[in-house]
Amino acid sequence: MGLISRSIPTLLRGISQASDATKQPDHADIQDNADSNPVLGLTKRSGLEYVANISNTTLGNVHVQTINRDVDQRFISVFSNGNVRVFELDGTERTVQKPDGTTYLNTTTPRSDIKTVTVADFTFVVNKTVTTAMNSSDLSPGNITQAIIFVSQVSDKTTYSVTVDGVTVSDDTSSDSTLSTTQVATDLRTGLAAGLTGFTFQQNGPVVHIKKTDGSNFSIDGNDTQGNQDLVVVKDSIQRFSDLPTVSPHGYVVEVKGDDTTDFDNYYVRFVANNSTVDGTLEEGQWEECAESGIEFKFDYDTMPHILIRQSDGDFRFARVDGDTYTDLNTAGTYSQSGTTVTVTSANHGLSSSDSVQFDFTSGNAVDGTFTITVTNANTFTFTASGSLTTSGNVAFGKVNNSTLPKWGERTVGDLVSNPNPSFMGKKINNIFFYRSRLGVLADDNVILTTVSEFFQFFRETVLTVVDSDPIDVAASHTKVSILKHAIPMAEQLILFSDQTQFVLTSSSVLTLTPKTANIVVATEFESSDA
């Protein structure tokens, strides 16, 4: 074959596995220890800079997540079977508090079963082997069986009637010299109290509250001869929100069903009194949208993704996302004990007498006790122990500052239909990611994204309308079974991978991704590994 001479425009295209006939002139077959840099050209690949070992033994099957908080604070987190450790880049190991234990991390294959994503100081951790669940032991606050009678207006020559458990009481205004909604309500309450046993009544102006003393159910109905325009009887539900009075028992939950003139589904409201937090207090207040009573409304935190959070002292905390408060045990010292008096020595401890301080005496990464201290000087303080401690040793402590962990959002409005559980509930979460200011998870063939900028909220905050910032829950539709395994944000798109098909999460709106505009379309169909 004759020698061919020609110019090559660049050496930066790297290697190509295409056939010789289809390769570009600047594609190479082999490139060893070279870096194709568009600024510097083809340069020698940088060598290894050895810094430190993060372990003197083989780590084995682990999941590693790099935490790049900023240019000065970078960490390596290592998740193994039932444990998590965090290291600085120089190999220094940071303390990880584990108040809820590490049962969530139990898996013999953490490299493939643990998935993580870091957002600011929070690293969200998913164990693919754990099935999510709702908390079935704590249900949304609800009603005892009760009712209110509301005389909204009064008319001359009108009869108002209320029937409770078959007992009917009426009041006729034909002979009244003065028309008063309060007087009509009083007459109805007095008549019912005289004709019924086992009931309690309370009245505030034109509103009468009625319930049975044993909390059991009862029937109630009411009418007036003005076409039922004056008298409103509420027991569990009502047609129009505008018919509800501004005086009601605190905590009373009512379903607003709507009528032919409304364009919304049913929703629920709870009465909040202005000057009381005691359920049943009958006074002025306002109605607020709420969840149906007696339903599951929050997650089982043990089964949901956990977080690895960087604390203010630079150490870390691995915990459930349950809203607990905690104190940073960010100061070290030594202690000795004489009788019940414990003396702690720590240079420039910065505490004051009467401070409430938490201590870890056992190096178990958890609080062993909380005590009120007496400062001796800038370097020592004392407290009285309730029992015997180890005579002396090292101690970690911190002033109680009640830092609060985030908490997974709850179903605060609607019911299981209007504000359903996210589709990952009852399933295993396959992966977790961050996209367009939303935290997202993959479960089966669904992509579930939180409320915009609310990384812990998977429920809607109102069911009266669909808001652009609401959570998004969409499924990948395909003739093949498409269990989504990976999600990669790229160029304003979210690329989704299943075993045999790749999808793209798109929006019918160029600028926004909303529950109304989100859509998943097929991109390519190649087999991919789950590694």
Please annotate each region the language model reported.
Residues 58-69, 104-118, 428-431, 482-486, ...:
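Repeated scaffold domains used in trafficking and secretory/extracellular systems
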Residues 72-80, 123-126, 438-443, 485-498, ...:
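Short beta-strand elements that form the blades of beta-propeller/WD-repeat-like
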Residues 89-95, 102-157, 205-236, 240:
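Hydrophobic or amphipathic alpha-helical targeting/insertion segments
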Residues 453-457, 506-513:
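Short loop/turn segments immediately following beta-strands, especially the blade-tip
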